[in-house]
Amino acid sequence: MALGGGTFTSQNKELPGAYINFVSAASASAALSDRGIATMPLELDWGVEGEVFEVTNEDFQKNSLKLFGYAFDSPKMLGLNDLFMGAKTLYAYRLNGGGDKAANTYATAKYCGVRGNDLKIVIQKNADDASKYDVTTYFGTVKVDTQTVAKAADLVANDYVTFKAADLAVTAGTPLTGGTNGTVDGTAHQAYLDKIESYTYNTMGVVVTDDITKKLYVAFNKRLRDELGIKFQLVVYNLSADYMGVISVKNKVTDAGWSEAALVYWVTGAESGCAVNKSCQNKKYDGGFTVDTNYTQN
């Protein structure tokens, strides 16, 4: 019974008729699963080499210096800041590993890369015990570690350097030098794809401008989607892929020191966090890059 009869809850109705309650199970979430998981291969000045490593939004804000070599609000982190505006978790891979580690008489950088050249070791006599030294590690202008020891053998490796068995001597600051980034080539991109294939993520983004590398990623996307049933979206820059699994970003970035394809960061994050019953169409860009929007109607 509907309308005047009301909804049946107990045998207290006055109007005759059939009262039927329809109770359905809780509907499935439109999200289907936790979204906001992205993956990207990155060119970095510091960080883990040869492995996929997980970074959450919280990790990025709290441990960006340790993970990427720069504070999260550094201009060098502009791309990742854009990514984490939409993403919750990033599976990152460093493309340019395999370079040289910076070093000096007392220590060697934990990772290769030019950022290691901004490390320095300061050694002072301990104020309370003249037989001991205060050994301080600086990353840029940030003090990241201090240890008080009698000899170098007592020093423990920290998140930035490993120490050598050298004779300690007072120094106002001995910089580490010789750090270099590795070379990015097709082999590095393929190594990333081999590593990431076993992971689960919503969106993959790659910041490149050459069509050969873009097509390598498109082929990977098609194989996983069509042959293995693993559905994810690939974000690339300015490529007519004509495929439902690929998102092509047309607008270019004009900021000095950044690839014109850098808007891929923001789109990758936004798409990864977008629910399956929603769309990023007409979503306003609110990231930190300067975007070329000087287009005509045709």
Question: Can you say where each PLM-predicted feature lies in the sequence?
Answer:
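A glycine- and small-residue-enriched flexible loop/hinge signal that marks low-structured segments
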Residues: L3-S24, A28-G47, V52-T56, F60, ...
